[in-house]
Amino acid sequence: MDKNYIKAAIEAILFAWSDPISSSELSNILDIKVTETKEIMKEMIDEFNFHKRGIQIIQMNDHYQMSTRAEYHEILQKLFEPKQNKGLTQASLETLAIIAYRQPITKTEIESVRGVKCDKAISTLFEKNLIEDRGRLEKTGRPILFGTTLHFLKNFGLKSLEDLPKITEIDQANEEELIKDIYNQQLKGR
């Protein structure tokens, strides 16, 4: 494999996989030697640092993770400041519907259903206390499992998850419409 292709693949893996990943896991995925992976990771870390990019690759023992640079903390903090009195966006509603019907579920599984990244939606749902961390999945990387909260049930006027409309005859694409309808009904009742 071409070295530039390997670097691009590693960058994609680190971006998609938010948890630290070991050089041996990267090697297995890319079907290259661990020594080659470590050499390429060293080069990539140096390149990211040399160009002072907004993101960096950090190394923790034999694990690697992509993160933002500390000097952009204040800027990023503004992005994640709680937005008061804002409703849920379409993306947040879709993400919430997927979590409600398929919990416990990982971020990767949610993104697989939605077809797009869901970091902002998950952050918003956590901020509004509609979802919570339900532990870790026992597989490589131990991704977080998400589920809905009691606050979710209260806000949507549900006694339990069994009160969610049944989707046996409804296709998966309409899950978010069900949550949106419940959400809109609750807003009208206030």
UniProtKB/Swiss-Prot annotation:
The terms describing its cellular component in GO are:
cytoplasm
Q: Which domain of life is it from?
A: Bacteria
By its UniProt entry, which HAMAP family does this protein fall under?
ScpB
Which subcellular locations apply to this protein? Cytoplasm
Please indicate if the UniProt record lists Cell cycle as a keyword: yes
Q: How does it assemble?
A: Homodimer. Homodimerization may be required to stabilize the binding of ScpA to the Smc head domains. Component of a cohesin-like complex composed of ScpA, ScpB and the Smc homodimer, in which ScpA and ScpB bind to the head domain of Smc. The presence of the three proteins is required for the association of the complex with DNA.
Can you say what this protein is called?
Segregation and condensation protein B
Q: Coiled coil located at which positions? A: none
Broad class of where this protein is predominantly found: cytoplasm
- Origin species, per record, is Alkaliphilus metalliredigens (strain QYMF)
Q: Name one Pfam family in it.
A: SMC_ScpB
Is Cell division included in the keywords of this UniProt record?
yes
Task: Write out the transmembrane intervals.
Answer: none
A Gene Ontology annotation in the biological process aspect, one of them, is:
DNA replication
Its family? Belongs to the ScpB family.
**Keyword field:** Cell cycle, Cell division, Chromosome partition, Cytoplasm
By its UniProt entry, which InterPro entries does this protein fall under?
Answer: ScpB_csome_segregation, WH-like_DNA-bd_sf, WH_DNA-bd_sf
What this chain does, per the record? Participates in chromosomal partition during cell division. May act via the formation of a condensin-like complex containing Smc and ScpA that pull DNA away from mid-cell into both cell halves.
